[in-house]
A protein has these predicted regions:
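Interfacial helix-loop-helix linkers and transmembrane-helix boundary segments
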Residues: 40-49, 67-75, 95-110, 244-252, ...
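Hydrophobic transmembrane alpha-helices of secondary-active transporters
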Residues: 35, 58, 78-102, 235-238, ...
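Alpha-helical membrane segments and immediately flanking helix-loop junctions
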Residues: 77, 81-82, 89-95, 110-120, ...
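Entry/N-cap segments of selected transmembrane alpha helices
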Residues: 33, 101-122, 273-299, 350-354
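Transmembrane helical segments that form the transport core of multi-pass membrane transport proteins
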Residues: 215-302
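Alpha-helical transmembrane segments
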Residues: 159-177, 287-295, 318-321
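N-terminal alpha-helical transmembrane segments of multi-pass membrane transport
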Residues: 1-70
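Membrane-embedded hairpin module used as a gating/binding unit in multi-pass transport
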Residues: 167-243
């Protein structure tokens, strides 16, 4: 009887995850716990980092059976086949007001300038030995746009998706810490004190026509990014039409929350010890930081140039909002500007380049897809 009991215990042990648990699995579970602490305890992008972190823990439990048909396989299908990022863009579009951009169209140039960091990191990654597709996927981290980073990584470097997504969302959450020193480095006290004129009112007609025309023009130029731009602008059309409130509300809330859970959890599920614990992950984190710093600096420098051209009417601080971390980057511009001049209110002005950055990052991704092409699956 004792022998039968021992055999039963041995069988239970052999079938358990403990039997195949490795040091790598333990390390990645600890990484997941640290990310949960940062998300819940410190408030770093909790809506995104929490499910990413929990997915990371789940991915590193041996014999989890996730490769079998079921809900987890559906989630992974949505990640690897670019289903979730466009749906996220639908929700983002429904929550985005392009009014500040339409009221001051030249801020579109600031959103474009902030994409310079993407291409700087791309070149740096290639110099470090990454393939051109991997380098492109790493570079897009500089746009501070998680869904676009995941979309491009799934197409060009699926093996790096977990590291790229974590880097992108981490730097998005660290915008208030990373950007202010760079903004102050490239501006003077006088620059930061500049008060900008109030934006003109934007008509309902302009707000309705913009997403339609933007979709047509960008999609014809870069067909590979039609899914992202099309869904972004469809969501915005829901918001601005005035007769689609139910669709707008669903896109902003129920759909956005559901897809966020699935996208973030699926991203965490890609963070297995085998794919994450290597020197490439460290390089990706470093290159992502370089890309983000480069994008912020390029936006501020272009803002300073714009200030010189228009006779001091543009506060260069709004250039840092050209990265597409909406609305965190615009808030940082407001905070830094108000510290220099308490009468300064830059938030709405900074929202122009901020929403332009969302478009700019998608365009940068489409440009790289058109020039380089996706990796063969």
């Amino acid at each position: 009887m004792f022998d039968a009991f021992v055999v039963a215990l041995t069988s239970v042990w052999a079938d358990s995850g403990f039997a195949e648990l490795t040091g790598g699995h333990v390390i990645m579970m600890l990484v997941g716990i640290v990310l949960l602490y940062l998300a819940i305890g410190k408030g770093f992008e909790p809506l995104l980092l929490s499910p990413i972190a929990f997915g990371c823990i789940l991915a590193n439990i041996p014999k989890n059976g996730f490769e079998e048909p079921g809900v987890m396989s559906v989630i992974m299908y949505g990640i690897h086949n670019e289903v979730f990022p466009p749906l996220i863009f639908l929700g983002v579009g429904a929550m985005t007001d392009f009014g500040p951009l339409l009221a001051n169209p030249k801020t579109l140039l600031l959103g474009a300038a902030a994409q310079a960091g993407v291409f700087v990191a791309l070149l740096g990654a290639m110099m470090m030995g990454f393939t051109v597709q991997e380098a492109a996927a790493i570079g897009i981290i500089g746009g501070a746009d998680g869904p676009t980073s995941i979309y491009l990584a799934a197409k060009m470097a699926p093996q790096l998706l977990g590291a790229i997504a974590v880097a992108a969302y981490s730097y998005m959450s660290l915008v208030p810490l990373i950007q202010p020193p760079i903004m102050k480095l490239f501006t003077t006290e006088a620059d930061r004190k500049i008060v900008m004129q109030q934006l003109r009112p934007v008509s309902h007609f302009e707000k309705v026509v913009f997403p339609i025309m933007c979709t047509i023009v960008i999609s014809l130029l870069l067909p590979s990014v039609t899914a992202l731009i099309g869904m972004l602008m469809l969501g915005n059309l829901f918001k601005e039409a005035g007769c689609l409130d139910r669709l707008s509300d669903t896109a902003q809330n129920a759909l956005m929350n559901t897809v966020t859970i699935m996208l973030a959890t699926g991203t965490g599920l890609t963070m297995s010890a085998e794919s994450f614990l290597n020197y490439q992950t460290i390089l990706i984190i470093i290159l992502g930081l370089i890309a983000f710093i480069g994008g912020t600096a390029a936006g501020v420098i272009f803002g300073k140039l714009m200030c010189m051209v228009d006779g001091g009417q543009t506060n260069p601080l709004i250039g840092s909002a050209g990265v597409s971390a909406v609305p965190m980057a615009a808030r940082v511009s407001q905070i830094v500007g108000q510290k220099a001049n308490p009468a300064n209110f830059l938030l709405m002005h900074a929202m122009g380049p901020n929403v332009a950055g969302v478009i700019g990052t998608a365009v940068a991704a489409g440009t790289m897809l058109a020039m380089i092409g996706p990796v063969a699956k």
